[in-house]
Amino acid sequence: MSKKMNSTPKKDGFWMPGEWEKHDQCWMIWPERSDNWRLGAKPAQRVFANVANAIAKYEKVTMLVSHQQFENARNLLDQNVRVIECSNDDSWMRDVGPTIVKNKDGEIRGVDWVFNAWGGFKGGLYFPWDKDDAIARKVCEISNIDYYRTDFVLEGGSIHTDGDGTLYTTEECLLNENRNPDLSKEQIEENLKEYCGVEKVIWLPLGVYNDETNGHVDNLLHVVSPGHVVLTWTDDTTDPQYERSKLAYDILTNTLDAKGRKIKVTKLHQPGPLFITKEEAEGIDVCDTMSREPEQRMPASYANFYIANNAIILPIFGDKYDDLAVKTLQSVYPNHKIETVMAREILLGGGNIHCITQQQPTTK
């Protein structure tokens, strides 16, 4: 039976493993919000199904879905995808699900962060968010794993780790006054070390341009292995993303990781830029929080991919840089199959494949 722990992962000898380590399964949540997903979320649901079905070729997938959408999800998903009825507010499993940590014996536990919809009452994207804040605990209870409940606001997409002592994040997100305003940078870093079991935090100034999550690091870069990352890039110095990526590149290439390694940075050219069309904007129900206007630039990125067992599930956009992204990632993941999914519909909702997935590492 799952139980809540009163210590911290670091004190108990647990740490956040690298995402490339073997998984038992992947968790997702079915989309249905009509104020975030166009045309009643029908186009997004088809793409979520494509993502889940692609991952399910390599590892187990569990899809959480509201009771209203259970039959629809079951019909669109392959039979080897497990579907479980579970109340939710939206479908960003990376941000609301548990961060799974492990110890040297292969035991796993979950970290249940506080979720406030990317800002609470100071710029948050929807209200209420209590169902989403309960997702991490529910996942742990379904999986029968113990968990730590923190009093620290954090989304899973705002951190990346190399599984070997180093964590990457952005100041734009974690130091934003709408997350943990009463904590200093040093206190925030201490929380990351205690609950992710890391030794060093590498702070990057900014995420991807116009990212409504306040610059999540998982849209900016992905960790390939200890001492190696792929970084969203553009050579266009007039593009607002250029300065953001250049700042990150300069810090990464002049910083040693927790084990004293120089960090290798592989540039991953961004798509587009891509913009919301008038037709797409008109298909989304108007609300007071989430902005979806015609000609609004979207935070498109190829770094927002999922590492499955022996495969990379990569978002593509029908863009001229799609083939280059596949080639770049195949070069850094020579033993993985690159599975592409047309993912513009996820991008229209504000994120991409990494944002809608959460891995559960294998136990020994």
Swiss-Prot record:
The EC number on file is: 3.5.3.12
Give the top-level enzyme category.
hydrolase
Q: What catalytic reaction does the record list?
A: agmatine + H2O = N-carbamoylputrescine + NH4(+)
Q: Which UniProt keywords apply?
A: Hydrolase
Q: Per its UniProt record, what InterPro entries does this chain match?
A: Agmatine_deiminase, Peptidyl-Arg-deiminase_porph
Q: Does the keyword Hydrolase apply?
A: yes
Task: Return one GO MF term.
Answer: protein-arginine deiminase activity
Q: Which residues form the active site?
A: 355
Q: Which SUPFAM superfamilies match?
A: Pentein
Please provide the Gene Ontology terms (biological process) for this protein. Answer: putrescine biosynthetic process
Recorded superkingdom: Bacteria
The residue range of the signal peptide is none
Is Hydrolase included in the keywords of this UniProt record?
yes
Q: Which family does it belong to?
A: Belongs to the agmatine deiminase family.
NCBIfam families in the record, alphabetically?
Answer: agmatine_aguA (TIGR03380), PRK13551.1 (NF010070)
What is this protein called in UniProt?
A: Putative agmatine deiminase
